[in-house]
């Protein structure tokens, strides 16, 4: 009983934090969280995936065959609806 209440309370707190971060003006928390989840060692990226998942911005572009995602600021494969 105590464990289930603790897990429920922890889940609600986590939900509150994510909702607050997504509604904040800066909206940096979800982006940093996703970037850290999908970030990997640079040797692994070059070996297995090319430059998929590299961080990018206006000045630092991506490898050929990839585009910079305007939302998440990492390199993705071009597809429908992506520039």
Swiss-Prot record:
It is found in: Secreted. Expressed by the venom gland. GO terms for cellular component: extracellular region. Its main location: secreted. It comes from the Eukaryota. One of its GO terms (molecular function) is carbohydrate binding. Residues 1-21 form the signal peptide. Transmembrane segments: none annotated. Disulfide bonds join 51-63, 56-68, 62-75. Residues 22-49 form a propeptide. It holds the Pfam family Toxin_12. Keywords: Cleavage on pair of basic residues, Disulfide bond, Ion channel impairing toxin, Knottin, Lectin, Potassium channel impairing toxin, Secreted, Signal, Toxin, Voltage-gated potassium channel impairing toxin. Belongs to the neurotoxin 10 (Hwtx-1) family. 51 (Hntx-8) subfamily. Hntx-8 sub-subfamily. The presence of a 'disulfide through disulfide knot' structurally defines this protein as a knottin. Weakly inhibits 5HT3A receptors and Kv1.3/KCNA3 voltage-gated potassium channels. Agglutinates erythrocytes. This is U5-theraphotoxin-Hs1b 1.
């Amino acid at each position: 009983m105590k464990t289930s209440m603790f897990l429920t309370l922890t889940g609600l707190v986590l939900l509150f934090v994510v909702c607050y971060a997504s509604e904040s003006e800066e909206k940096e928390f979800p982006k940093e969280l996703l970037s850290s989840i999908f970030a990997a060692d640079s040797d692994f990226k070059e070996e297995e995936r090319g430059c998929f998942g590299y961080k990018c911005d206006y000045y630092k572009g991506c490898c050929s065959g990839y585009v910079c995602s305007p939302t998440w600021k990492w390199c993705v494969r071009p597809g429908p609806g992506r520039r």
